[in-house]
């Protein structure tokens, strides 16, 4: 039963890591990255559709994204969605593909994005700590219900703390790497 609590906590913490990685992917670092467009949805035949399902996204150069629609008739819809998005990038439509040139980041913008990265990383750590609290509460409930002994509870609490420490360290590493990537010129 104790292993179930730890496995459940590990699984939820892994989901937090994946969520953080998705968040970081959406923060542009001055170079082209297809995940920048993950949050862009296009109204395609009356349905909000993720851009990557109706077009291929390639990176021909370090700071250029090339969006090639599978269906040429959707080009105007894609252009409209990209203009409406909060990416801060103006699409260039040449009639068959859309080019997105990622502008170089100013020093001030880099610092602002680094602050945003820290905030997102801190939110992920809070989520991990909440998962730890839930796991600890579950362990205490089991001890109260006499499903585990007091010694087993102490061991379980140590194991939960170790898993939490590992998860927080991983988040710190991810945050530091993203900050480093942002602050590189």
From Swiss-Prot:
Keyword presence, Protein biosynthesis: yes
Coiled coil: none
Keywords linked to the UniProt accession: Cytoplasm, Protein biosynthesis
GO molecular function ontology, one term from the record: ribosomal large subunit binding
Broad class of where this protein is predominantly found: cytoplasm
SUPFAM superfamilies noted in UniProt: Ribosome recycling factor, RRF
Localization, UniProt: Cytoplasm
Superkingdom of the organism of origin: Bacteria
Entry GO CC: cytoplasm
GO annotation, biological process: translation; translational termination
Function: Responsible for the release of ribosomes from messenger RNA at the termination of protein biosynthesis. May increase the efficiency of translation by recycling ribosomes from one round of translation to another.
Family listed: Belongs to the RRF family.
PANTHER family reported in the protein's UniProt record: MITOCHONDRIAL RIBOSOME RECYCLING FACTOR PSEUDO 1 (PTHR20982:SF3), RIBOSOME RECYCLING FACTOR (PTHR20982)
Name of the protein in question: Ribosome-recycling factor
Lineage: Bacteria, Bacillati, Bacillota, Bacilli, Lactobacillales
């Amino acid at each position: 039963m104790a292993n179930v609590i730890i496995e459940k906590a590990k699984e939820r913490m892994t989901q937090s890591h994946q969520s953080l990685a998705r968040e970081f992917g959406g923060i542009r670092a001055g170079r082209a990255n297809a995940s920048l467009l993950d949050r862009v949805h296009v109204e395609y035949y009356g349905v909000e559709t993720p851009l990557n399902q109706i077009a291929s996204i390639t990176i021909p150069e370090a700071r250029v994204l090339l969006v090639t629609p599978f269906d040429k008739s959707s080009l105007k819809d894609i252009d409209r969605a990209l203009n409406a998005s909060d990416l801060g990038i103006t699409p260039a439509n040449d009639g068959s593909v859309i080019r997105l040139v990622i502008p170089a980041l100013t020093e001030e913008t880099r610092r602002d994005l680094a602050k945003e990265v820290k905030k997102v990383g801190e939110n992920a750590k809070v989520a991990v700590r909440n998962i730890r609290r839930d796991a600890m509460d579950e362990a205490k409930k089991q001890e109260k219900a006499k499903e585990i002994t007091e010694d087993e509870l102490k061991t379980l609490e140590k194991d939960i703390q170790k898993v939490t420490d590992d998860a927080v360290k991983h988040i710190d590493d991810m945050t530091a790497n993203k900050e480093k990537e942002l602050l590189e010129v």
